[in-house]
C-alpha cells in the first residue's frame, strides 16, 4: 500500500530529479505548453503553480526565489511581467494536464501540461494576424489568400 507516500521519485536520484523538474518548470513558463510523461507532468504541476503564485507577489525576494528555481533570466522576466498579470485574479489552478495516450516508441503514457488560458492567448494572436492580413489585402485590392 502507498499510504502516506508523497512525491514522485521518477527513477532518479535527488539531484537528477531536482534538475529535471527545474527544467520542466522553466520550459512550461517559457513555452506555456510541454509534452512529457504523466508522472512527470503530475510532479511538475504543483511547482509551476507555486512559481506563478510567487510571481504574483512581485517583490525582490520573490524574484530571487524564482531565479533559484528557473534556469533562465528570460523565464523569470516572463513569469513576473506576463504571467503574473494574466493570472492576477485567479487563485490557484494555473495549469492543466491533458492526457495524450501512449507514446509510440515505448508505450509510456504521455500528457501535455499547459498553462490555463494559453490557448486563448495564442488564438487571439492568430485572429489578430488574420485580421491584419485581411485589412492589408483589402487596401491592396486583392483576396486575403492570394499571393502577391
Predicted features along the sequence, with ranges:
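Structured, basic alpha/beta domains of bacterial-type, RNA-associated proteins
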Residues: 1-19, 23-148
